[in-house]
């Protein structure tokens, strides 16, 4: 007895493969768009007197051009690595230069500030929130959903995250 495959079985196998490949592609596309479209927030150490900051002042802090808050505390910006997709929005809006130049700006801002850098880079939102909570004068840029009670949310240009017109809104 000779067994032969049905002519459409190969096509059915290819169809399953293409459906699975399409599913993977859609998942990856959604993941990338979520990473790029995240809403960011500014948070500060609770002992920090800063509850609101203008956009030009945020740019100065980000570039290490502001050394002290009005209350005299040293300024430290804590952020995720400029190479992470989560920071794309921040780089575009605040630094307005390519990632490689942002790294140069950060290195220049930190030059001569041993022990108290102008800008600190961390690996995760959780680490960022913990650093901001533990360093007086610290301010951080974090995914809005990583905020917890250990830090204070800072208004940017008079707006809180998720309010219409907020400058670090991801979409």
Residue ranges and their predicted role:
Residues 5-7, 30, 57:
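Exposed boundary/loop context
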Residues 20-31:
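Bacterial N-terminal signal peptides
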Residues 1-18:
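N-terminal secretory signal peptides that target proteins for export/translocation
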Residues 15, 31-32:
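Hydrophobic alpha-helical membrane context
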Residues 11, 29-30, 134:
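Residue-level detector of alpha-helix boundary/anchor positions
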Residues 6-8, 21, 162-165:
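Generic low-complexity segments that are intrinsically disordered, proline-rich and/or Lys/Arg-biased
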Residues 35-171:
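Exported/periplasmic ABC-transporter solute-binding proteins
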